[in-house]
Every structure is written in C-alpha cells, then in structure tokens.
Amino acid sequence: KNRTLRLVLSCVLSVAALVAVFFAGVGASSLFYDDGLKSLLWFKEQIDKTYYQDVPDDAFWNAAIQGVEDNVLDIYSQYYTAEEFDRTVSENQGIMGGFGMAFFSGSNKIARVSIGSPVFYASKTADFPIETGLYLTGIGKSEGELVSTFTYDSMAKELSSYGAGETVFLRFTTMPVASEAELSAAQSTVVSVTSAEYTESYVLYAADSKAWTYLEREKVWQDVSEYVSLDEQVTGDLAVLRLVEFNGNAAAEFVYALQQFEKDAKQTLLLDLRNDGGGNLNILCNIAQYLMKDAPASNPVVLYAKYKSGMQINYSAGANLYNSYLSGKKVYVAANGNTASASEALMGAMIDYGTVSYADIFLTDTQGKGFARTYGKGIMQTSYSNPSTGEAVKLTSAQIFWPNGNSIHGKGVTTDDGAVAVSAVSYGEYPDAELTEILNRITP
C-alpha cells in the first residue's frame, strides 16, 4: 500500500485528535490541541533530522493542513500508535499471536506458516503438511460447520471473528477452488487450531530426508520432519537452509543449522532466501559472518549506509567465521521477487567476498521469459519513539551499499547480472517444484 506523507500524517492527526478536518479538498483548520500539536512537531522534527531525503517545510505543512496528495515520503515510512509500536517490537522479537499464517496479497493462498505457531503444530495431525502454497478454503466452529472461504474477503471475514484462545476448524486444499463442486474434487484436510501467543522460529534446515529447526516452545533443536515437507525433497550430498526473516532468534538458529550441516558432512548447501523480506540489521551482520569467504579476518564490512548529512557508517560483522563450517563446501542461493532488503544485502556480501558468483544464484521466473530479479530494496528504515506518548514513526534513514559500493535499489539482483532463472508458476507453490528443479541442477 502506498504510504504518502499525507497518509502518515493522517494517522498522526487522527490518533492525537489534532485537527477537526484534515483530508484533501477541505480547508485548513486552526483547531489544534496542545498534545496534538506536540505530536505533530515531534513528527516533523524526526523527518527533518533523520529522513534520508529533504522534505521542504511547505510540502510538510501542505500535507498536514490542506491534505495534498503528493508522495512526499516513500512507501516504507509508517506511523505507529503506542499500542501498534509495542506490538511491532514484540513481533520483531518473534513473539506473535494468532494462528500463524500469512497470505499472498488479496488471496486465500498461504504465503507462510510461522514455524512454532498453532497451525505449524497442527500439521502433525493433518493429511499433509500445512505450508506455503496451500489454500484456506473453509473455516468453522466444527468440522461439520465449515463456512467455505474461496476468496480472500470471505476468508478474512471468517478469520476475524475468532479471537485469542478460541478454537477453530480450518480446511486446506492443495489447489484453488471456486465452488463446492470443485471442492469435492480437490485434495483437502481439516485441522483444529487454537489461537494463541507463540514465538516464531526463522530457520528450517533439511538433509538426508530429515528437517530440523529450533522450536522455542520446547527450547531445543529438533527433527520436525512430521510437520513439513522439505525433508522429502532433500537427499544425497545436499542440504537446504531456509532463512525466513532476519528477526527473533534467527542468528542463533542459523548457527544450529550450520552445526547440523557439519554433523551431516554434506558438501553442498543451498541457502533459500525466497520470500525473505529482510529484517534486523544486527541479525544480518551476525549471520553474514559465516558466509563471507574472502573477507578480512576481523570486523569485515557487511554493508555501509549513507545518510543525507553525508555521513557514512560501515556495518560490520565481528569476524570472518566462514571456515568454521563452510571451508571446502559449495554454496548456492535461491531467491525471488520477494527477496528484499537484508536478504539482498546478505547476497551482496556473499558475492563481494567470493562465497558465491552470480551463476550460483537461482531466481524465480514466473513469466517464462528467462528474466528474473529480487525485489531491489537498497534503503534502510529506523524507528523512533516519542518518550512522552509512546507513539513512534518508522522512517527511511539511509541508502545502503554492498561492500564494493554497489547499490541494488530499484534494480535488485537479476538474471542480467548472470543469475540463473528457474521457471515457476508463482512465488509459492505446493508442492515446491521450483526447489526440486534447483536441487536437480546442483546435484553433484
């Protein structure tokens, strides 16, 4: 969703009860409350000090008072109420609530099942693992009272009627269905799930027909083959390490996966960054230190940031730990158009320090034209909280560059660079035929 300065300000103003009338086409109002004015001035101060581009005063005040439609801030800038910001902080730590599913935009197709969530654990009793590419086609209080949810709107409506602690029955199908007749012909499974708080895990590893992850509930690195299908695809001298996001306990989980890789004595590792939209910069640096083959021994630069003041800051890993687990190994990367930000920065560090070449990167081609790319996000955001109110804003604060100075903002990593296109119907199919194709190509 495109967020302009006007839209961000509308959140500030509505939450703070700042003006009587705000939106476009309405005259200016002088009905300011003291607390609201303080919030607005604080917000402007953050933009002036930290936003990576200059925002003229007249553009800011026109957006605030007259409701102009200009796109003054970029799409990544966002305002949070105190409650929203607290929730965001918790989610960045991996602490979630609900059933544990995310969907592709405007669809009832699953984009992700959070590892460690109620739906993840429900896979144990399902006829097949509940994961990316399935469709949520029924929701109800019992298996006999399922309401068909063949569209996003119907699915969202039904899901929203269940709160924390409530149990719901969910029906999943392996293909999209638009009618009861199509449903009867589709492969489906129904599970019972209770909405609850959980801590998400962000790393899934597979080799030798087994899948592993660190489950926060059990506080242990364990075999989760009965919950996922990834184990069924990975055999031979290969291993797959899927990194979902750079959040929560991902850095420690990544090390657990590398230790398992060492124990399994495999020679080839596929780092799966498909649909990884990025995350925390510190976690990125902690993970990158294991993936930068020819980097300096100490404090290797993972990326650097340029701020509008002209200041440049290097963000570095503590050490080059590549040889701890990957010495003499072959590493490949899988990515797609949803691979963004920290994921692209990690790819950049791996390329610049000789861990992989562009030819070792596989990109999802959904158009069948031989061209594919990652998202192309070469800017970073920083959140700033107002200590007086608890509200916060997330603003784009800097441009980011690979160690060699390359910026992929607006471009991404592409097949034009030498990366390899792999055909797929979409960015999330069940079963994962794209992964099977990649594994076939890299099998020694």
Segments (PLM) and residue ranges:
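Extended, small/polar residue-biased N-terminal targeting/export presequences
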Residues: 49-109, 167-169, 173-179, 184-224
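Gly/Ser/Thr-rich loop/hinge elements
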Residues: 201, 208-230, 278-334, 338-341, ...
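Extracytoplasmic/secreted cell-surface and envelope-processing proteins
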Residues: 120-121, 146-153, 179, 249-253, ...
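C-terminal, low-ordered peptide segments at domain boundaries
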Residues: 144-266, 289, 314-323, 412-430
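PDZ/PDZ-like domain segments forming the peptide/carboxylate-binding groove
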Residues: 92-152, 220-224, 244-251
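Gram-positive cell-envelope targeting signals
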Residues: 1-51, 61, 65, 92, ...
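Terminal peptide-recognition signature
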Residues: 43, 64, 68, 101, ...
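Short acidic catalytic loops
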Residues: 133-140, 241-242, 260-278, 334
